[in-house]
Swiss-Prot record:
This is Copper transporter 6. Disulfide bonds: none annotated. The chain crosses the membrane at residues 47-67, 99-119. The gene is COPT6. GO terms for biological process: copper ion transmembrane transport. Keywords: Copper, Copper transport, Ion transport, Membrane, Transmembrane, Transmembrane helix, Transport. It is a multi-pass membrane protein. It comes from the Eukaryota. It comes from Arabidopsis thaliana.
Length: 145
């Protein structure tokens, strides 16, 4: 079936289904506290839960940057298999958390987008930039776990 000549469906056409339990997913950025982030029903319609959601997304982004710039992932000075497994586990955790932040941003909520970017920026400033590093930090060997 050729759909090339059909007009794109509008967001309002998605609402006119007979199933009243369907929730419309935003396809453009919007501002407001009534949204769902990551899980069905969370944060709901409460302003307090929305603020908690923003704090969680911010902290997840900071943690991703911390893990990305941690000495565990650099792994200089040692080549043991145990440390390689720890590096792999930390990398896997970092990647999983980064995907959670990405999925939160895919809610198209403007507040979530802003706190995610702010979290990555603060995390990079604290752990990745030279603003808070000693000059000798990059020369330190891989620490014992």
């Amino acid at each position: 079936m050729d759909h090339g000549n059909m007009p794109p469906s509008s967001p309002s056409s998605m609402v006119n289904h007979t199933n009243s339990n369907m929730i419309m997913m935003h396809m453009t950025f919007f501002w407001g506290k009534n949204t769902e982030i990551l899980f069905s029903g969370w944060p709901g319609t409460s302003l307090g839960m929305y603020v908690l959601c923003l704090i969680v997304v911010f902290l997840l982004a900071v943690i991703v940057e911390w893990l990305a710039h941690s000495s565990i992932l650099r792994g200089r000075g040692s080549t043991s298999r145990a440390k390689g497994l720890v590096q792999t586990a930390v990398y896997t955790l970092k990647t999983g958390l980064a995907y959670l932040v990405m999925l939160a941003v895919m809610s198209f909520n403007g507040g979530v987008f802003i706190v995610a970017i702010a979290g990555f920026a603060v995390g990079f400033m604290l752990f990745g930039s030279t603003a808070f590093k000693n000059p000798s930090d990059d020369e330190k060997p891989f620490e014992q776990l």
